[in-house]
A protein has these predicted regions:
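An N-terminal alpha-helical hairpin/helix-loop-helix interaction module that forms a charged
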Residues: 1-45, 61-191
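Cytochrome P450 catalytic-core helices
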Residues: 52-56
Length: 191
């Protein structure tokens, strides 16, 4: 049963994030069922959205990102990415991947950061660089930045706002309204 769950999770989805979202949700549902059946609801093992995105990331880091809420929310606030990710095991994968894709795009444009990243392949600590994943898509680096920024308080000295839930909702509504108005304007200009 567990092997089949992982096979389904790792099945190619062609990059369709809606399909991937459904695969994650199905995996979590089956995992919760097994936990209730064999462990009577005692959670000895990680059984959440973070752990499942971790499995996907370890399986294929070039096409997946790890989601760790405590680190992601703080990072998103710092870069003023206020779109709604959802909560708990109901994370909106498409929104989270959009933020990560924007981060990767900015990282790839920074020559100094790319030079520093490529220096990790220089064998100075007794590890064969050929054993490293090349991280051509920079998804590993993206999570390193998100995780380390929060873990090591690299936000120190940066002024940023951590909006409350209602403020976030209002920002999201304003953004959606602005996008709607822009689309209406573009349609009107085409006529």
């Amino acid at each position: 049963k567990v092997r089949k769950m992982f096979q389904e999770l790792f099945r190619d989805d062609g990059g369709d994030l809606q399909v991937r979202q459904k695969k994650i949700e199905a995996f979590l549902e089956q995992s919760h069922q097994l936990n209730n059946q064999y462990e009577n609801g005692v959670f000895r093992y990680k059984d959440d959205f973070h752990s499942v995105t971790g499995y996907l990331f370890l399986y294929d880091p070039d096409h997946n990102y790890i989601y760790k809420a405590s680190h992601v929310w703080r990072f998103a606030d710092c870069i003023e990415f206020y779109d709604d990710f959802g909560m708990g095991d109901h994370v909106k994968l498409k929104t989270y991947y959009r933020m990560c894709d924007e981060l990767v795009k900015a990282m790839k444009a920074d020559a100094a950061l790319m030079a520093t990243d490529s220096s990790r392949f220089e064998n100075g600590w007794g590890v064969d660089p050929a054993t490293f994943h090349p991280d051509t898509e920079k998804h590993i680096l993206a999570f390193d930045i998100i995780y380390c920024s929060s873990t090591y308080n690299l936000f120190k000295g940066i002024t940023y706002v951590r909006p409350k839930t209602k403020e976030r909702q209002l920002m999201q509504e304003k953004k959606e309204k602005a996008q709607e108005l822009l689309a209406n304007l573009q349609r009107a200009q085409e006529q």
